[in-house]
Design a protein with these regions (language model features):
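Extracellular/lumenal regions of secretory-pathway proteins
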Residues: 1-169
Length: 169
């Protein structure tokens, strides 16, 4: 999944998100529509099996929109940038090797086109090349809730369960 919050760009949504499976777009949401919509016909089959799927995805879109817009404002302050065009992004998801069964989760954030903070999938530690986000990485590394839910449970279990459903269509 890709999430983007931006500021200072006229005639462009301040938030855009979309999901991909095997490099094929499956969903799209932005701050203008505030609704997550399917981008593949086979997603309708998924809806019949999981009737609340799109309602839940829309809720996630709206929640992530608020979170990313907040993160964008925090980043602008940390980098002492209040005006101009700025972009805050998150890319997260999972990979599953059907042959070996190997699972790999990833979660990374960027600001203005540069890496900001990334989950190292080997060490399960947050790392950052930027001094402005060292405190955030340290705080996340010491937060049991983030470590247990986000890193272990979601990225290596829930995400993979959904990925397996998607690739079956």
């Amino acid at each position: 999944y890709f999430y983007t919050a931006s500021s200072g760009i006229e005639n462009f949504p301040s938030y855009v998100s979309f999901g991909l499976v095997d490099d094929v777009q499956i969903s799209y949401c932005d701050s203008r529509t505030n609704e997550n919509i399917p981008k593949q016909d086979w997603m309708d089959e998924l809806s019949s099996e999981h009737p609340t799927y799109w309602m839940e995805e829309t809720e996630t879109c709206r929640d992530k929109q608020q979170i990313l817009k907040g993160n964008l404002e925090i980043a602008k302050k940390r980098f002492s940038q209040t005006e101009g065009v700025h972009v805050f992004q998150q890319m997260y998801g999972c990979e599953w090797d059907e042959e070996t069964g190997e699972v790999k989760g990833y979660d990374q954030f960027g600001y203005d086109g540069e890496d900001l903070i990334t989950l190292d999938s080997n060490t399960q530690q947050w790392v950052t090349p930027r001094t402005q986000t060292v405190n955030t990485a340290n705080r996340w590394n010491n937060d049991r809730t983030i470590k247990e839910h986000e890193e272990k449970f979601y990225l290596t279990q829930t995400c993979v369960e959904w990925l397996k459903k998607y690739v079956n269509y």
